[in-house]
A protein has these predicted regions:
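Phosphate-binding site recognition
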Residues: 1-216
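A cross-kingdom feature that marks ATP-driven nucleic-acid transaction machinery
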Residues: 178, 184-347
Length: 347
């Protein structure tokens, strides 16, 4: 029946596999001509860090977490991209080869996958991704940024981008009301896409003419900010491992998502990188990637806590997931209940 309904030749001994999430949803799952039960609805996610690091083979044990994360900040945990990594080369050379040469896999792949997956609607979806490349936005903010009306169109486009793995919809519990957040935030969750839109696409002509010389990640505009977003994506994508490190394995999680409180009525807002809520406890998780992480990390989280009016009498715990040199004052302050170095996410 499936083969007949979508125009494929039928054969009793053959099984057909279709790819492209939006095509499958539109032409099979939501097609009235499809009759039958779905055996399995499987969405392939990127590899967890403990598996992604295996692409470095024996060299992984000799590489710093920072160097591994430099590459993963560009590739994410996508196996096809990790196959292009040469473990013997430094991170910067791997990135140069993959992104900043005309024959590089990551230089060519964005337009190809977008055209294959989304067809004629690829241009609109790319505009949406550009709008959230600088940080998460809600649906109304995205519609305004790209100049289209709010409503079904933007919702449908975001749903397809989420299904395809480009976007994550963050909609946890509001800690001030203990109810589901009414306005979801849409985050660009695919590290390759953000890196491409921020740094490769604007230089495409120079790269094609072999005139662009990539020297260092630090020389890229706003790299420290983008690096923070990329590291946050990797931490959020590896929440299962983080649960273990925070002693939450086996605990029922009511909500786990970034949370943003807007400024209103003259009061300042705040952004929590990851807010984990259980029946009795709220975990405020800060994610930092800097060369040196000092007392400002403590001050920032303390300020955020002061701006949130937690509902009920729950315990509050704090955690810092970090990559960089941790100043002794941070550990000595005792402010963070858990300090999680990036190395632990790979284990």
């Amino acid at each position: 029946m499936l083969a007949m309904s979508i125009g494929l030749p039928t054969h009793p001994a053959k099984c057909y596999a279709a790819s492209g999430p939006s095509w499958i949803a539109e032409n099979i799952l939501n097609n009235t001509g499809f009759v039958g039960r779905i055996s399995r609805d499987l969405v392939l996610r990127e590899l967890p860090l403990r598996d992604a690091v295996k692409f470095w083979g024996a060299a992984a044990s000799r590489r710093s977490a920072a160097e591994l994360l430099d590459v993963l900040s560009v590739t994410g945990g996508v196996p096809r991209y990790l196959e292009e990594v040469r473990p013997s080369l430094p991170a910067l050379e791997n990135i140069r080869r993959m992104c900043f040469l005309p024959e590089g896999t990551l230089f060519k792949d964005f337009k190809r996958i977008f055209a294959d997956v989304f067809g004629p609607r690829a241009a609109l979806k790319a505009r949406i991704l550009r709008a959230i490349a600088d940080g998460p936005l809600n649906g109304a903010e995205i519609a305004k940024a790209i100049g289209i009306g709010r409503g079904g169109t933007i919702s449908d486009e975001l749903d397809e981008l989420e299904l395809a793995g480009f976007v994550a919809k963050d909609a946890g519990l509001n800690p001030e009301t203990a109810t589901r957040t009414r306005t979801s935030q849409y985050r660009l969750s695919d590290n390759y896409t953000r890196f491409y839109l921020q740094y490769v696409e604007p230089r495409a002509t120079e790269i094609e003419g072999r005139k662009y010389k990539f020297a260092a990640l630090e020389s890229l505009p706003r790299w420290s900010t983008v690096l923070g977003y990329q590291f946050e994506n990797l931490v959020l994508a590896n929440f299962d491992r983080l649960q273990e490190l925070l002693g939450l394995k086996g605990t029922e999680i009511l909500s786990a998502a970034p949370w943003r409180k807007k400024a209103a009525d003259g009061k300042s807002g705040c952004q929590i990188d990851l807010l984990v809520q259980t029946a009795r406890t709220v975990w405020v998780v800060e994610v930092k990637r800097r060369a040196r992480i000092g007392e400002e990390a403590v001050d920032e989280v303390r300020t955020k806590l002061a701006r949130i009016r937690f509902k009920g009498r729950k315990s509050i715990r704090t955690a810092l997931v970090y990559c960089g040199e941790l100043a002794p004052v941070v550990r000595g302050s005792g402010f963070f209940d858990f300090l999680v170095p990036a190395e632990e996410l790979f284990r």
